[in-house]
Swiss-Prot record:
Organism in which the protein naturally occurs: Sphingosinicella xenopeptidilytica
Keywords of the record: Aminopeptidase, Hydrolase, Periplasm, Protease, Signal
Subunit note: Heterooctamer of 4 heterodimers ((alpha:beta)4); each heterodimer is composed of an alpha subunit and a beta subunit processed from the same precursor.
pH dependence: Optimum pH is between 8 and 9.
CDD domains tied to this protein: DmpA
Activity regulation behaviour: Inhibited by AEBSF (4-(2-aminoethyl)benzenesulfonyl fluoride, Pefabloc SC), ampicillin and AMP(hyd) (ampillicin-derived penicilloic acid).
Family annotation (Gene3D superfamilies): L-amino peptidase D-ALA esterase/amidase
Protein name stated in the entry: Beta-peptidyl aminopeptidase BapA
Family matches, as InterPro entries: ArgJ-like_dom_sf, Peptidase_S58_DmpA
Record carries keyword Hydrolase: yes
Main location class: periplasm
PANTHER family referenced in this protein's UniProt entry, alphabetically: BLR5678 PROTEIN (PTHR36512:SF3), D-AMINOPEPTIDASE (PTHR36512)
Single GO MF descriptor: identical protein binding
Amino acid sequence: MTSTQRLWSGALPLLTALIVSIAATASLAGPRARDLGVPFEGTPGALNAITDVAGVEVGHTTVISGDGAMVIGKGPYRTGVTIIHPLGKTSLDGVAAGRAVINGTGEWTGMHLVDEVGQFLGPIALTGTGNVGLVHQSMMDWSVGKVPEEALFSRLLPVVAETLDNRLNDVFGHGLTRDHVFAALDGAKGGPVAEGNVGGGTGMIAYTFKGGIGTSSRVVSAGDTRYTVGVLVQANHGDRNDLRIAGVQIGKEIKGAWPEVNGIVAAGPDAGKPQDKNSLLIVIATDAPLMPHQLERMARRAALGVGRNGSTAGALSGEFALAFSTSHVIPLGGKPRLPAIINDTDSETMNALFRGVVQATEEALVNQLVASETMTGANNAKVYGIPHDQLARIMKARFPRR
């Protein structure tokens, strides 16, 4: 075990949270898609993040340790967990929710409850496939002492979603610990959200480039009323040959930056074939007072935002969307609080919200590409971040007046 591994596995939650906070701050320093000249439609919130929806908090734990050949149980590890508290970490209440399955080859726990009663209680966790069980149990453990004992049953079905980080990470080695999960749960906060190689997105690959966590938001208007729609994605999907940014076939125009193993560009019978697999998670938050079936409609529109960037939801790419409303609160042990109801036939409002989901999903996916940096992981596999200089040059040539 390396010194780095000992640090991660043996650290107290407070120390782990400090390390995670430092890493997250560093990842906020880089450019976002708009900084490279990528044009987007719609009006973002002040942060252009899911945390523009009041009350939403996000936390990450990032685990990076070891190099070279993979030895199961010893690494290298490139994994983590991302936590979203819909109403903040101190709230005991739930929220109305709806979800959509774009392609079902993956796992998102707690979704049968969402389908049946249109709500969930507690945080959302995004992580790597091999961590689902550990994260699920850790979230239950974290609730003990925070939720009254007579109401602990409300935390029996944690909401945990996964994408497969096996290219860069020892997925069977279980590099994530209970303390890591607690650190993300306790360290979640509002404000700017770290993107790229952080949290659950640490070991992910998107469109054959390095992928990870991305976020965006839109402020939409219907008459005199304004609502905010925020989106956070964990991207591990897509094929470079399909990638479009602002309608431009970026994946085909960018030169080089193909994945390598031991310094050699990947080759063999699968080289050049579509690689759209391994999954995509989309979390949608809004302050619009929506019913569960309306939130399901919102979740379905996320697929249109994904399609704008060229993904076809490959046969083995588990792609899911979950939408919730911070205005439709389910008090623990009480009656739901809903300040108003938006009629399903109110096309002006619903269409504005749908448009916000599509636009924010599209931008969140580009933001995660821009934020994700080149990474070398298990078995010396190296995946490149999308080259900023090439992307900026292409955008400037196509959109010179922006």
